[in-house]
Amino acid sequence: MKKMLVEFRDFALKGNVLDLAVAVVIGAAFGKIVSSLVDNIIMPVVGVLLGGLDFTKLSVTVGKSVIQYGAFIQSIVDFIIIAFAIFIFVKILTSFMKKKEQPVEETPVPPTEEYLKEIRDLLKEQQKEI
């Protein structure tokens, strides 16, 4: 049992797992911020531009069921904003990574075949002298 706890601790404290946990927490908080932005700022402005439309009240009643397509539209706007923000973040991150990974100058590999030919020619000359 103790060995399993030690293995779990080692697994949980690996860099990738901790990075993922932090990313999930930050992502959840960012999602709440974007939802608030969409619900409280963007959609009311869009509603005013569309003639006083309140997206939170857009719905269709079918029998006893209520289909709230206004809330669905707000969720789509949420998704688009979050996806765009993630796209920009990844783009910036990859540009930093490319700058960090500057190409290492490769030392030219000596032309081994040329050296072998020179050695062969020198050996032939030495044999002629003997």
UniProtKB/Swiss-Prot annotation:
Its main location: membrane. Pfam families: MscL (PF01741). The gene is mscL. It is found in: Cell membrane. Homopentamer. GO terms for cellular component: plasma membrane. This is Large-conductance mechanosensitive channel. The chain crosses the membrane at residues 11-31, 70-90. It comes from the Bacteria. It comes from Listeria welshimeri serovar 6b (strain ATCC 35897 / DSM 20650 / CCUG 15529 / CIP 8149 / NCTC 11857 / SLCC 5334 / V8). Keywords: Cell membrane, Ion channel, Ion transport, Membrane, Transmembrane, Transmembrane helix, Transport. Channel that opens in response to stretch forces in the membrane lipid bilayer. May participate in the regulation of osmotic pressure changes within the cell. Coiled coil: none annotated. PANTHER family: LARGE-CONDUCTANCE MECHANOSENSITIVE CHANNEL (PTHR30266:SF2), MECHANOSENSITIVE CHANNEL MSCL (PTHR30266). PROSITE patterns: MSCL (PS01327).
